[in-house]
Amino acid sequence: IVLIFDEILVGFRLARGGAQEFFGVRADMVTYGKTLGGGLPVGVVCGRADLMRRYREDRPADICLARGTFNAHPYVMAAMKAFLDRLETQPIKALYRGLDHCWDERADRFNRRLHERGLPVRIAHLSSIWTVLYSRPSRYNWMLQFYLRAHGLALSHRGTGRLLFSLDCSDADFEAVLDRFV
């Protein structure tokens, strides 16, 4: 059985080593997306050598080639290298220190404000990945995304109620989101 982590969404939001580091589990294969390319369009599949081999043992000349217009695009490769190099710098390491505490505190503050205002919405989160949950069913819940858009906020994933924060979201930026949401 091969354990595959899909980190297209989670990427490096939880830890410098991704979800594998955060959960203390080593996957056999991992996928990454635009985070690794600094926002540029990229998809990466990596894993154990035996799973990533491009040929068959019984037919070594039968090489698998993947062709595409943007494969190994120089801008994307440079952005990926810059991202990976920066992961090793002290400012980035410092950004990850205390990350859970920071986002736990912010989620608690957000939920308190929602509760104080009597709104039927709560936030569940994993670090800076937030999901908006309704505390009671209503045929009007879908309208929240349009209200938020009118106030300059967009839920990701076509209305599934996901808020994705940048790791360097300042306290002032967070307060602005909270004020607009509530």
Regions found by a protein language model. Name each.
Residues I1-V182:
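Conserved N-terminal phosphate-binding loop of PLP-dependent enzymes in the Aspartate aminotransferase
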